[in-house]
């Protein structure tokens, strides 16, 4: 589970790097419009976005299997790794997205505002995926009756920033640092 969480997390960071590099490459190589290089970069970016989401759902499936097998330690390690090491990703993603979309919407005189929901939806799906891993761990704790976190923690796993506080509270309650 921890390996899959690391792969998913690396994919998230790779997507962030590509979110910066691909548009820059498209601007650099796109002097003559949508040529082969620009299309290739754009297609590569989209393919990597799909791969990151596939890795996320594979991680969720692995968490579900760990839950079914009662592998609390394995699930806790993957969940902890995924939640805590994704904090810088979400901060950088938010800052970059605000900057880029502010510039794009301003430069297009508002026309690009229609595309703003796309990266927001992409990020929300990542949050849902990591939240599903957290829910599997919480369900396992409740199943084993080990210092059960309250049911509110299920919902908190799906809210950015609050999910981190929920994660830390649960880990402290379990005696983890």
Predicted regions, residues:
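Feature detects long, helix-prone N-terminal segments enriched in hydrophobes
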Residues: 1-177
């Amino acid at each position: 589970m921890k390996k899959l969480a690391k792969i998913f997390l690396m994919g998230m960071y790779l997507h962030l790097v590509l979110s910066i590099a691909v548009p820059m490459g498209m601007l650099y190589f796109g002097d003559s419009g949508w040529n082969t290089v620009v299309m290739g970069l754009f297609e590569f970016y989209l393919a990597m976005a799909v791969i990151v989401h596939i890795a996320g759902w594979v991680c969720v499936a692995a968490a579900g299997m760990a839950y079914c097998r009662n592998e609390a330690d394995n699930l806790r390690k993957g969940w902890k790794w995924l939640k805590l090491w994704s904090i810088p990703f979400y901060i950088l993603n938010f800052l970059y997205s605000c900057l880029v979309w502010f510039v794009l919407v301003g430069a297009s005189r508002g026309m690009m505002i229609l595309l703003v929901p796309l990266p927001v939806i992409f990020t929300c799906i990542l949050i849902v995926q990591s939240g599903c891993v957290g829910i599997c761990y919480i369900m396992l704790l409740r199943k084993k009756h080990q210092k059960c976190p309250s049911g509110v923690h299920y919902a908190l796993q799906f809210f950015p920033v609050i999910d981190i506080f929920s994660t830390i509270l649960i880990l402290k309650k379990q005696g983890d640092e």
